[in-house]
Each structure stands twice: as structure tokens, then as C-alpha cells.
């Protein structure tokens, strides 16, 4: 195996071995605490601009397959593991993790102390870095890492959104039955693609939505022209303030159409409501984050992937209230308007990977559309 380096902008350096494609990759280095679901993570467009380090010590045990992807290709800038399993022990596997990364040009590194890296990022915060399996000397990489642009203010959504509208018809997938039939469509939904995951679209179809996916640049007028029963605003990468055109479009829809936002969509709704967002020290990236429903007191274990959060106090004067709180750090995990049929969550109720505790939120969206006559 070729040697490889990981160099962070604060000078911390790790020597390891090459994984996947040979080359260099740069981006914001973050850690993810899920034990499985690496294929879904790799193909989640929300990771555009980031190098993902998995905290679980062995990754790749079950290989990769065609069904578990969350988009048309991997989107991570780079991938870090302690050990990549050379054996894929799974009858569904079509390739090893290493081969999959190499085929898609994803540069990775393995055989580094991911515990030390995780503690460093926890204490110092997520930061830009470079993986290189080309450099013999890591010293020149440090200056380049310090010159990286970071995520704040950048429009990464434009890099992952759909080029044109399309209709989604595929239902869920089950091990025993494969792709399952979907119910007749009851609602017409326009889904803003900020980096939307396939399993979100499957969940929308499962509750009876005829889903039209539109680019993030779609205007308010274009959405209203479609006469939807509901609007969905998806997950996506980076800083929500980097997409002012989408914020403006969503602002024009508030109170006019039942609306549901997830992850970046939650942040976009917060900004459209006149609120503010801020960057978290190292973000929430994992499949076991406890979230409390303020109204019921019930605790949900949730899948999360975000580096920014909404300040709930900044929207409270505009008719909004927090609905969910993160029990680890107290950050806002959900919002709803007191009068309009609009709500959002910061986490991922569709899971993939992760628990299904919050799947009921899709049915809540269907209920709002039903009440509006959908």
C-alpha cells in the first residue's frame, strides 16, 4: 500500500496508508460516529465539501451494493478510516469499499489513529485539511490546507442540485421483496433538491405523494404555478446563508402552501422566517443523537448530519417556536409556525442510515396537506 498523509490546517499531521483512489483531496474534516451505513454516508450529497472520518474502527465489512446508495454517485471529498476491511462478508456485496472508492475517484486514508483525530476535532473544532497519497513530504500540504476556503458563505448546493425538474416514482426497498409497490398518489408535492437523498423521496412516495423534484434555483412563482398540495425542502451541504436565492423563494411560499423542511431545509426555513443560523464547533454527524419533543416529552434517537444550527430566539418574534431540542447540547432540532402549516426538523427522519424513530414526521406532513384539501 502506498503511504498517505492527512494534514490539518492547525498543523496536526497523521501518516497512514492510501485508500481508494491515489491522489489528493481537500475539504473540511469532520467525524461521523455511526457504526454502519458508510455507503449511504458516501453517497449523501450533504457531505459535499467535506472529508469524513469514521470513528468506528473497522469499515467496509459488508462491501457495497447497488441498492443502498442515496444519490447517483459518492459526494464526499475524502474518506478516513482506521481499517478498511479487505473482505466483504455479505451476499449482497458487489465490490469492496476500497474498489468502490477507487472506481469513483474518492481519495481516502486508512491506518491512522482515528480516536486521536476525533478527540482533536472535538477539542479544536472541525477544520480544513488535505489527504495526499502523492506527497512524500507533508510540509508543503500545510500551507495549502491553510489556504482552503472553508464552508462558510459558499454555495455548495449549486454543485449537487438537479439540473432540471424530474418526477420520482420509486418506492421503498425491503430485503425480502426488493422494491415495493407505492400507494396511489393523493398529494402533489414539489421537492426542492438541495442535495436530496433517495430515501427521502421514497418516504414521500410511501405516504402517497406524486413528487416533482426541482432545482434549488426554482422560484416562488414556478412552484406556485405547479399548484402543489405541499412543498418539501431537502437536506444539503454547507452553509445555508450561501443560498440566498433559495431563502428568498421559500420566503415567498410561507403561509401559502404546507411546507416541510429537513436538515438544510430546516435552516433555510429559519432564515426565510427572518432568523439567523450559526456554525457549530464540530457539527452533529451520527446515528444516535437523542432529541426531545418539546410538546410530548418523548425522546427520539435520531440520525444527524449538519454543521450549522438555527437560533430559535431569532425567529420567536415572527410566530415560530421550537418543537425539538438536542439533549446533548441543547441546540434547536425542530421548528413550527404557530398559525401556518409549516414545520421542520434539523435531523433525518428518513434515516438511511440510522433509526426510524422519527418516521412519523412524514405522516404529519401528509396530515397537513389533507387539512388543506390535498
Residue ranges with predicted function:
Residues 1-221, 225-226, 240, 352-354, ...:
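RNA-binding accessory domains that recognize and position tRNA/RNA substrates
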Residues 18-19, 56, 282, 304, ...:
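Short clusters of small/polar residues that mark proteolytic maturation junctions
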Residues 107, 188, 258-260, 276, ...:
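Proline-centered loop/turn at the N-terminus of a beta-strand
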Residues 113, 263, 306, 348:
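Active-site glycine-centered loops adjacent to acidic/histidine catalytic or metal-binding residues
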Residues 188-192, 302-303, 343-347:
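Active-site-proximal beta-strand elements of phosphoester/diester hydrolases
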Residues 229-230, 234-301, 309, 354-369:
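Cysteine-nucleophile active-site neighborhood
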Residues 297-340:
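Catalytic beta-strand/loop cores that center a nucleophilic Ser/Cys/Thr
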Residues 334-371:
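A glycine-centered loop/beta-turn motif at secondary-structure junctions
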Amino acid at each position: 500500500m502506498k503511504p498517505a498523509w492527512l494534514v490539518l490546517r492547525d498543523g496536526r499531521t497523521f501518516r497512514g496508508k492510501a485508500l481508494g483512489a491515489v491522489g489528493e483531496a481537500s475539504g473540511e474534516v469532520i467525524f461521523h460516529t455511526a457504526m454502519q451505513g458508510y455507503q449511504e454516508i458516501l453517497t449523501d450529497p450533504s457531505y459535499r465539501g467535506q472529508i469524513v472520518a469514521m470513528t468506528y474502527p473497522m469499515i467496509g465489512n459488508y462491501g457495497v451494493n447497488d441498492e443502498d446508495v442515496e444519490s447517483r454517485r459518492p459526494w464526499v471529498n475524502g474518506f478516513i478510516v482506521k481499517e478498511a476491511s479487505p473482505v466483504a462478508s455479505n451476499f449482497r456485496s458487489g465490490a469492496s469499499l476500497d474498489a468502490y472508492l477507487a472506481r469513483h475517484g474518492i481519495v481516502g486514508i486508512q491506518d491512522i489513529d482515528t480516536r486521536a483525530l476525533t478527540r482533536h476535532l472535538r477539542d479544536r473544532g472541525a477544520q480544513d485539511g488535505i489527504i495526499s497519497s502523492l506527497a512524500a513530504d507533508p510540509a508543503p500540504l500545510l500551507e495549502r490546507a491553510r489556504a482552503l476556503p472553508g464552508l462558510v458563505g459558499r454555495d455548495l448546493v449549486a454543485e449537487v442540485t438537479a439540473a432540471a425538474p424530474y418526477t420520482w416514482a420509486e418506492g421503498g426497498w425491503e430485503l425480502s421483496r426488493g422494491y415495493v409497490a407505492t400507494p396511489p398518489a393523493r398529494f402533489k408535492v414539489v421537492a426542492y433538491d438541495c442535495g436530496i437523498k433517495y430515501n427521502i423521496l421514497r418516504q414521500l412516495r410511501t405516504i402517497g405523494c406524486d413528487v416533482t423534484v426541482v432545482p434549488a434555483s426554482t422560484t416562488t412563482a414556478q412552484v406556485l404555478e405547479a399548484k402543489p398540495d405541499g412543498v418539501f425542502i431537502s437536506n444539503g451541504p454547507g452553509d445555508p446563508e450561501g443560498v440566498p436565492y433559495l431563502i428568498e423563494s421559500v420566503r415567498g411560499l410561507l403561509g401559502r402552501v404546507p411546507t416541510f423542511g429537513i436538515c438544510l431545509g430546516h435552516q433555510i426555513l429559519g432564515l426565510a422566517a427572518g432568523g439567523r443560523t450559526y456554525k457549530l464547533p464540530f457539527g452533529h454527524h451520527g446515528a444516535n443523537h437523542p432529541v426531545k419533543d418539546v410538546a410530548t416529552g418523548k425522546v427520539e434517537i435520531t440520525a444527524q448530519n449538519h454543521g450549522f444550527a438555527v437560533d430559535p430566539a431569532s425567529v420567536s418574534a415572527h410566530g415560530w417556536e421550537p418543537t425539538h431540542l438536542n439533549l446533548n447540547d441543547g441546540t434547536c432540532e425542530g421548528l413550527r409556525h404557530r398559525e401556518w402549516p409549516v414545520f421542520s426538523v434539523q435531523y433525518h427522519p428518513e434515516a438511511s442510515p440510522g433509526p426510524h424513530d422519527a418516521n412519523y414526521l412524514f405522516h404529519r406532513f401528509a396530515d397537513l396537506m389533507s387539512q388543506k384539501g390535498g
